[in-house]
């Protein structure tokens, strides 16, 4: 079983290998934070309106603007983080493929090309899923708890 230190070291090594664009990553995470903030502001406006038993035109406009801003910021964040995830996977495949090519001839005799290709594609797809789905989902959930 993996220990916490092993996981952190593995993620650090993966970070060094893949060299993600930190500027884009920062922008994506900031946009995610902003989108989450707007989405959490909407229920507060509605709650206040329900407590006062009236929903003015101004509040409706603010709610619509918040929905729009949530959509824009969350959409841009998802696009940027997805793009970064694909670049990370591309780098992982490149690094892995270059290592496979440099392995001795005896290794290639023991392992079929189709098996190596299948492993490379499937393993990087699993890493893609972690970065693109589970990381973004856990980050969004964390934002909700932080802002609540």
Curated annotation (Swiss-Prot):
Origin: domain of life: Bacteria
Molecular function as annotated in GO: ABC-type oligopeptide transporter activity; ATP binding
Protein location: Cell membrane
Keyword Transmembrane helix: yes
Record-annotated membrane-spanning stretches: 26-46, 60-80, 127-147
Boundaries of every ABC transmembrane type-1 domain copy: 25-148
Keyword field: Cell membrane, Membrane, Plasmid, Transmembrane, Transmembrane helix
Record-level GO cellular component terms: plasma membrane
InterPro entries in alphabetical order: ABC1_TM_dom (IPR011527), ABC1_TM_sf (IPR036640), Type_1_exporter (IPR039421)
Main location: membrane
Membrane topology designation: Multi-pass membrane protein
PANTHER family noted in UniProt: ATP-BINDING CASSETTE SUB-FAMILY B MEMBER 10, MITOCHONDRIAL, ATP-DEPENDENT PERMEASE MDL1, MITOCHONDRIAL
Protein name: Uncharacterized 16.7 kDa protein in epiA 5'region
Organism (species): Staphylococcus epidermidis
Gene label: epiY
């Amino acid at each position: 079983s993996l220990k916490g230190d092993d996981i952190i070291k593995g993620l650090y090594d993966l970070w060094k290998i893949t060299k993600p664009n930190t500027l884009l990553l920062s922008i994506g995470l900031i946009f995610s934070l902003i989108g989450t903030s707007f989405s959490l502001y909407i229920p507060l406006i509605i709650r206040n309106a329900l407590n006062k038993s009236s929903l003015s035109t101004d509040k409706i406009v603010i709610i619509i603007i918040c929905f729009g801003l949530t959509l824009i910021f969350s959409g841009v964040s998802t696009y940027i983080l997805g793009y970064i995830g694909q670049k990370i996977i591309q780098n992982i495949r490149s690094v892995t493929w270059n290592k496979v090519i440099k392995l001795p001839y005896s290794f290639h005799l023991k392992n079929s090309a189709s098996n190596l290709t299948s492993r490379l594609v499937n393993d990087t797809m699993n890493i893609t899923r972690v970065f693109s789905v589970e990381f973004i989902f856990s980050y969004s959930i964390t934002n909700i708890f932080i802002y609540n």
